[in-house]
Amino acid sequence: MADPWQECMDYAVTLARQAGEIVREALKNEMNIMIKSSPADLVTATDEKVEKMLISSIKEKYPSHSFIGEESVAAGEKSVLTDNPTWIIDPIDGTTNFVHGFPFVAVSIGFVVNKGMEFGVVYSCMEDKMYTGRKGRGAFCDGQKLQVSPQKDVTNSLLVTELGSSRTPETVRIILSNMERLLCIPIHGIRGVGTAALNMCFVAAGVADAFYEMGIHCWDMAGAGIIVTEAGGVLMDITGGPFDLMSRRVIASSNKALGERIAKEIQIIPLQRDDED
């Protein structure tokens, strides 16, 4: 049977490359930077331009499909996940990196049907690396098959996370104390490149053993989530329970045992879900 979504995925790859060109071009020019929810939650005219290009191009080709986009939500649209084929888009994952010219910026496109991830495309713009994952077909970076690490021992693990954009003292305190508890297990280390999508792709590629974060959104995870699972990894809630795309929290791990061990150390930050008003 023909794969009904392969054409959509091929189109997503083409669009992600086009978006990457816009991002690289914009880096040469003066930026117009705006602030969203906190002084560290930034958006630029390029975020908005890229999202507009992606959504209008997809709408033209697939008018019956639904969309959740980071900048559309910031502008007041709702994040409602239905059973309809839905494109979940982060036009620039790593906007703060983009603003500073720090070389990790990604375009993330996730495609969800019946609330399940069908494919994901994450394009690392400055590195010119294309990560893809297709349900039942594996995960790849520029055509090379990805496989998570075999690491089950937390004391030999390298984790990836982010400090997030909240600057509320209590939230910052919890984030830092979670890192402290994990480091003192002890583990090999904690890294982070400033984009959840690429951090998750590093788990898929086997160069990091697990990623965890609270406070991120469905558009940060929808592209890379299926890349992790198709590379043999697991997604779970930060509590160790089942993963929920709209919950704003995730552990992406090379295996279940490692993910559950990390979950034991983490204090939860209470967050409003993406699908709550």
From Swiss-Prot:
It catalyses: a myo-inositol phosphate + H2O = myo-inositol + phosphate; 1D-myo-inositol 1-phosphate + H2O = myo-inositol + phosphate; 1D-myo-inositol 2-phosphate + H2O = myo-inositol + phosphate; 1D-myo-inositol 3-phosphate + H2O = myo-inositol + phosphate. Pfam families: Inositol_P (PF00459). InterPro entries: IMPase, Inositol_monoP_metal-BS, Inositol_monoPase_Li-sen, Inositol_monophosphatase-like, Inositol_monophosphatase_CS. Mg(2+) 2 binds at D90, D93, D220. It is an enzyme of class 3 (hydrolase). Coiled coil: none annotated. Belongs to the inositol monophosphatase superfamily. This is Inositol monophosphatase 1. It comes from Sus scrofa.
